[in-house]
Amino acid sequence: MESSSPALSVAIAVLAALLGLTGFGVYTAFGPPSKRLDDPFDDHED
């Protein structure tokens, strides 16, 4: 089996990191941790 190029390995690692961060952000925004998020506009009602 021929070894893959280093550029392909780096590209896959960067893609996996971006997908992981995106998934974590969506989970934080819409999942159970979103109950602890504050809305700054609600804190400063006029």
Swiss-Prot record:
Q: Main location per UniProt?
A: membrane
Protein's UniProt keywords contain Signal:
no
**Topology with respect to the bilayer:** Single-pass membrane protein
The reply to whether Transmembrane figures as a keyword in the UniProt entry is yes
What job does the chain carry out?
May play a role in photosystem I and II biogenesis.
Subcellular location(s): the record lists:
Cellular thylakoid membrane
Q: Where are the transmembrane segments?
A: 10-30
- Protein's recorded name: Protein PsbN
One GO cellular component assignment for this chain's record is:
plasma membrane-derived thylakoid membrane
> What is the similarity comment for this entry?
Belongs to the PsbN family.
What GO biological process, any one, is recorded here? photosynthesis
HAMAP family the UniProt entry points to: PSII_PsbN
- Per the record, the domain of life is Bacteria
Q: Which UniProt keywords apply?
A: Membrane, Thylakoid, Transmembrane, Transmembrane helix
